[in-house]
Each structure stands twice: as structure tokens, then as C-alpha cells.
């Protein structure tokens, strides 16, 4: 905080906050993780690790292959729980801000939200070519906002991938192995963290 002394009360100074500044622990780009709803409590692990890796915000969404279906009441309770986990992870990892965990959205709502971002990455198990993927990632500049779309267990349906491409998404690969939903987002975030902090 940047403060100004307003006066004194006894032996204590009275300060007025002029400006809040973020710690320099933040990534040079705002990265949003769009996560297809996974089974069980996997979302809690995903939120915790994504926050530790520097994500700016998390948008859970229901994909066609999402097994979990949350009504409005359950979605609200989950969002409160996930936000508390994000707060704890941010404090533990020395973050300068607490990432926002959005309320669960439909896939269409998530794509609409992502249209405001500069770059949308869609790791897809049928995509090939690590060189093409690295070219896309290395073209991301500090200050650009980035969205990462991760499917639930079973991945995305081809129609969902097409919809993401129409919204400006770029398909990327995470290698020759098929990763679990809770691993894919962390892998992509790690690659971005390394790339952006190396510029």
C-alpha cells in the first residue's frame, strides 16, 4: 500500500491509503482457466494448484461430457467453497491478489466470456505438432490476457472444439500422452508461466 500520513493519535500515525499495488509475484499476463466440471472433488485440487501457478481467474463450465451437473443452489455452494480454497492458496503462495472463481457457466457462456481475451488456447488430444504449439505460446506477449480451455474427463466433443475455434480459440497439444483433466490445466499453466517469466 502507498499511504499518506493524515495525522497522529498519541504515539500512532493515522494513515490514508492512496494506492494499492500488486506484489510482483503476479504473472505479466492475466491468465484465465476455463475448466470443464470434473467428477468428485477434483475441482478443489484444480483451483488450489491453478492459484499457486499464478492464474488470474477460474471459470468452471459444464461441457457435454461433464458427468457432474449442478443446479443453481449446488453451484452457488460449490463456488463459495472454491473461492475459499482460492483465497487460502493465494495466501499460502504469497500472491498479490486472490483470483476470482466464477459461478459455474454453460459452455456457451464460457466462450462468450472468453471472447474479451486476447488469446484463447484449447489443448486438444487430437491436435498434433508441438512446434506449432510452441509458436502459438511464444507469440503471447506480457500484458495480453489469455484463456485456457480444459475439457472434463473424456475431453471435448469435436463440436465444442469447433465452437471454440469460431470464438477465436487456437488448438494446441500438450504432447503425445493423454492427460487427466486435473493435469492438463496445470501443464498448460506451467508452460505459460515459464514462457511469460522468461521474456
What is each PLM-predicted segment?
Residues 38, 42, 149, 153-157, ...:
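Gly/Ser/Thr-rich beta-alpha loop segments that engage phosphate groups in nucleotides
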Residues 1-23:
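N-terminal positively charged helical leader segments and presequences
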Residues 10-12, 26-30, 143-145:
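Short connector loops at helix/strand junctions that flank enzyme active sites
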Residues 118-155, 159-160, 169-172:
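Active-site/ligand-binding-proximal alpha/beta "capping" segment
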Residues 158-199:
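Structured adenosyl-cofactor binding patch, chiefly the S-adenosyl-L-methionine
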Residues 75-79, 139, 190-191:
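Short, hinge-like loop/turn segments at secondary-structure boundaries
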Residues 18, 22-121:
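RNA substrate-binding interface of SAM-dependent RNA methyltransferases
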Amino acid at each position: 500500500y502507498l499511504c499518506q500520513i493524515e495525522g497522529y493519535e498519541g504515539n500512532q500515525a493515522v494513515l490514508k491509503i492512496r494506492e494499492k499495488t500488486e506484489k510482483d509475484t503476479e504473472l505479466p499476463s492475466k491468465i484465465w482457466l476455463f475448466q470443464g466440471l470434473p467428477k468428485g472433488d477434483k475441482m478443489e485440487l484444480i483451483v488450489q494448484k491453478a492459484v499457486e501457478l499464478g492464474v488470474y481467474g477460474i471459470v468452471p463450465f459444464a461441457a457435454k461430457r461433464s458427468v457432474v451437473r449442478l443446479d443453481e443452489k449446488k453451484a452457488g455452494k460449490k463456488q463459495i467453497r472454491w473461492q475459499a480454497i482460492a483465497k487460502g492458496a493465494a495466501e499460502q503462495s504469497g500472491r498479490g491478489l486472490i483470483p476470482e472463481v466464477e459461478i459455474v457457466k454453460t459452455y456457451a457462456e464460457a466462450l462468450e466470456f472468453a471472447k474479451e481475451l486476447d488469446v484463447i488456447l484449447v489443448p486438444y488430444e487430437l491436435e498434433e505438432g508441438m512446434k506449432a504449439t510452441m509458436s502459438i505460446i511464444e507469440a503471447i506477449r506480457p500484458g495480453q490476457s489469455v484463456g485456457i480451455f480444459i475439457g472434463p474427463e473424456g475431453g471435448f466433443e469435436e463440436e465444442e472444439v469447433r465452437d471454440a475455434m469460431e470464438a477465436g480459440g487456437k488448438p494446441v497439444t500438450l504432447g503425445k500422452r493423454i492427460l487427466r483433466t486435473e493435469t492438463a490445466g496445470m501443464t498448460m499453466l506451467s508452460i505459460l508461466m515459464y514462457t511469460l517469466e522468461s521474456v
